[in-house]
From Swiss-Prot:
One of the primary rRNA binding proteins, it binds directly to 16S rRNA where it helps nucleate assembly of the platform of the 30S subunit by binding and bridging several RNA helices of the 16S rRNA. Forms an intersubunit bridge (bridge B4) with the 23S rRNA of the 50S subunit in the ribosome. One of its GO terms (biological process) is translation. SMART domains: Ribosomal_S15 (SM01387). HAMAP family: Ribosomal_uS15_B (MF_01343_B). The keyword Cell membrane does not apply. This is Small ribosomal subunit protein uS15. Keywords: Ribonucleoprotein, Ribosomal protein, RNA-binding, rRNA-binding. Belongs to the universal ribosomal protein uS15 family. Part of the 30S ribosomal subunit. Forms a bridge to the 50S subunit in the 70S ribosome, contacting the 23S rRNA. One of its GO terms (cellular component) is cytosolic small ribosomal subunit. GO terms for molecular function: rRNA binding; structural constituent of ribosome. The keyword Hydrolase does not apply. Pfam families: Ribosomal_S15. It comes from Sorangium cellulosum (strain So ce56) (Polyangium cellulosum (strain So ce56)).
């Protein structure tokens, strides 16, 4: 779970303009951070299958957001992929 300080930092880092919390870049960055935290959780709790389902939901949600951004603006998509160090 993201703490409010972490969430605020991510929002400020990826926001397009002041007060931006809903742009695809911000949403994808927040989802990526939650996914990374869950991956750390699974390093010590391999048998936590309930949380694994939540992880799969987050990954598919991020995939849909990335597909949308790629369809709308390919340059923003490529920039975000590089900034987040995602494979693509």
């Amino acid at each position: 779970m993201l703490h409010s300080v972490q969430k605020t930092d991510i929002i400020q880092k990826y926001a397009i303009h002041d007060g931006d919390t809903g742009s695809p870049e911000v949403q994808i960055a927040l989802l990526s951070e939650r996914i990374n935290q869950l991956q750390e959780h699974f390093r010590t709790h391999q048998k936590d299958h309930h949380s694994r389902r939540g992880l799969l939901k987050l990954v598919s949600q991020r995939r849909r957001q990335l597909d949308y951004l790629k369809r709308v603006d390919i340059e923003r998509y490529r920039s975000l992929i590089n900034r987040l160090n995602l494979r693509k």
